[in-house]
């Protein structure tokens, strides 16, 4: 295989000329020495994105291109970007090309897998449906997650997507004990660091592989880091027959990175300036996240919603792939109710009596009915006040406000900020608590007792303390 030479550098994109008949294939990794990154040779990896003709390829760099010059030699590796897979990745932080960035020495695995992989065959996919308990009341009751499903956490800036993801990792590692893979795609480095320290303190790090491509990295790294993390998860599913959890924070940044390089690759932008290949790229990633007969990948994806607009092409394209959506609402966060999950906007494909059982389904629907009725009455209350409502409506409003507060819950991972110990609430406790509120058993309990409590028994303890 012959080497090529750089003919042009445009931001994160480089053009490389090879000899006739020696062109690397699309997605192949190229290597070049970038003195600004360090002294080691071939320290910058780029991925071939286009064949331009005249023996030239256009490649997207996975790190800074500052310091590259025309005429520099480029190595064709003859294969795609490959990342280490297997148990050696647990407890480690990798970057997009599979190198450890936690200063803990090399990753000890025997196997590497290429990051662009085919989707599992249709016949290998499993169709069994079962719910997956998270210990978070609002999620388990109203928008339950399916094992092997895809879950989207929608929310604008600062409503608590990352905290919710960290709590899910905590609860699942403690209760479920399976392996998790966390893909940090274009988010804050501080949050990545916090997550690592948090996991270390709560002893879940040895069950988790972390793959980071943060906000400060070039778009090439942010557009590929989700695939690197997914490849690590696929190994556990396919080779070790595990039920794996894949957390992606944030899937919007994957789309955003694609749109940053799209114009440099000469593609004509589509709606709102996004890349024309938006749904194809999203489909290639999402279709690999699935349950096979060997094991499953359950994925929880935080989805930033630009300007709180759910019809923006990036969140709208992601919607099509999801089994459950957990929508975080700024209005609920403003009321001081955390997790700020919107109980009426969030939905799940498995909220069905045949999957969850009749009692769970009925309680969930009753809770939604009471909350919806309260929402409908809010205009009347705002204009005429509570006194104009019928006795029945007053009772509905009172119960709805209790339900709203009971949907809040103290988190383990927020304990250091709030000083309140976190609570994991079993599904049976959640159903019992909400059923009793809807049936009117706690109409005499003050609504403040329901705020930031775990199960219904804790609410009654709070009420007793308030009374004394």
From Swiss-Prot:
Matching InterPro entries: AAA+_ATPase, ATP-synt_VA_C, ATP_synth_F1_bsu, ATPase_a/bsu_AS, ATPase_alpha/beta_chains, ATPase_F1/V1/A1_a/bsu_N, ATPase_F1/V1/A1_a/bsu_N_sf, ATPase_F1/V1/A1_a/bsu_nucl-bd
GO CC annotations, alphabetized: plasma membrane; proton-transporting ATP synthase complex
Enzyme class: translocase
E.C. numbers: 7.1.2.2
Binding site for ATP: 155-162
Keywords: ATP synthesis, ATP-binding, Cell inner membrane, Cell membrane, CF(1), Hydrogen ion transport, Ion transport, Membrane, Nucleotide-binding, Translocase, Transport
Superkingdom of the source species: Bacteria
Topology within the bilayer: Peripheral membrane protein
Reaction catalyzed: ATP + H2O + 4 H(+)(in) = ADP + phosphate + 5 H(+)(out)
Major subcellular site: membrane
CDD domains: ATP-synt_F1_beta_C (cd18110), ATP-synt_F1_beta_N (cd18115), F1-ATPase_beta_CD (cd01133)
Coiled coil: none
Pfam families attached to this UniProt entry: ATP-synt_ab (PF00006), ATP-synt_ab_N (PF02874), ATP-synt_VA_C (PF22919)
Subunit structure: F-type ATPases have 2 components, CF(1) - the catalytic core - and CF(0) - the membrane proton channel. CF(1) has five subunits: alpha(3), beta(3), gamma(1), delta(1), epsilon(1). CF(0) has three main subunits: a(1), b(2) and c(9-12). The alpha and beta chains form an alternating ring which encloses part of the gamma chain. CF(1) is attached to CF(0) by a central stalk formed by the gamma and epsilon chains, while a peripheral stalk is formed by the delta and b chains.
UniProt function note: Produces ATP from ADP in the presence of a proton gradient across the membrane. The catalytic sites are hosted primarily by the beta subunits.
Protein name, entry field: ATP synthase subunit beta 1
Annotated source species: Syntrophotalea carbinolica (strain DSM 2380 / NBRC 103641 / GraBd1) (Pelobacter carbinolicus)
């Amino acid at each position: 295989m012959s080497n090529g030479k750089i003919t042009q550098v445009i931001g994160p994109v480089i053009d490389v000329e090879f000899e006739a008949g020696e062109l690397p294939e699309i997605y192949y990794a190229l290597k070049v020495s970038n003195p600004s990154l360090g002294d080691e040779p071939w320290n910058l990896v780029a991925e071939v994105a286009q064949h331009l003709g005249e023996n030239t390829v256009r490649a997207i760099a996975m790190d800074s291109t500052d310091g590259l010059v025309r005429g520099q030699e480029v190595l064709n590796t003859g294969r795609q970007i490959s990342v280490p897979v297997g148990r050696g990745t647990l407890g480690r932080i990798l970057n997009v090309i599979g190198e450890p960035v936690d200063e803990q020495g090399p990753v000890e695995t025997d196997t590497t897998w290429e990051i662009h992989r085919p989707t599992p065959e249709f016949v290998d996919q499993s169709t069994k449906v079962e719910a997956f308990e998270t210990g978070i009341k609002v999620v388990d009751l109203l928008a339950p997650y399916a094992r092997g499903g895809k879950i989207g956490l929608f929310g604008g800036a600062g409503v608590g997507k990352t905290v919710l993801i960290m709590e899910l990792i905590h609860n699942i590692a403690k209760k479920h004990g399976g392996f998790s893979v966390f893909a940090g795609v274009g988010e804050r480095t501080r949050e990545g660091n916090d997550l690592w320290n948090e996991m270390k303190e709560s002893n879940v790090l040895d069950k988790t592989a972390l793959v980071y491509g943060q906000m400060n990295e070039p778009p090439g790294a942010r557009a590929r880091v989700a695939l690197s993390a997914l490849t690590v998860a696929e190994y556990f599913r396919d080779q070790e027959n595990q039920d794996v959890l894949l957390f992606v924070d944030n899937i919007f940044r994957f789309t955003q990175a694609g749109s940053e390089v799209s114009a440099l690759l000469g593609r004509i932008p589509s709606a709102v300036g996004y890349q024309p290949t938006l749904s194809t790229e999203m489909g290639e990633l999402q279709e690999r996240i699935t349950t096979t007969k060997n094991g499953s990948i359950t994925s929880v994806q935080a989805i930033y919603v630009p300007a709180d607009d759910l019809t923006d092409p990036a969140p709208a394209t992601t919607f099509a792939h999801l089994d459950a959506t957990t929508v975080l609402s700024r209005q609920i966060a403003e009321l001081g109710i955390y997790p700020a999950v919107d109980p009426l906007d969030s939905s799940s494909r498995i909220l069905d009596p045949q999957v969850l059982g009749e009692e769970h389904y009925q309680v969930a629907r009753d809770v939604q009915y009471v909350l919806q009725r309260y929402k409908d009455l809010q205009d009347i209350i705002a204009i005429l006040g509570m006194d104009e409502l019928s006795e029945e409506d007053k009772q509905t409003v009172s119960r709805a406000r209790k339900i709203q507060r009971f949907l809040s819950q103290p988190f383990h991972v927020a304990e250091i900020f709030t000083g309140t110990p976190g609570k994991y609430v079993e599904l049976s406790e959640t159903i019992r608590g909400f059923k009793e509120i809807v049936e009117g058993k706690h109409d005499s309990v003050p609504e403040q007792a329901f705020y930031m409590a775990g199960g219904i028994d804790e609410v009654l303890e709070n009420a007793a303390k308030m009374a004394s």
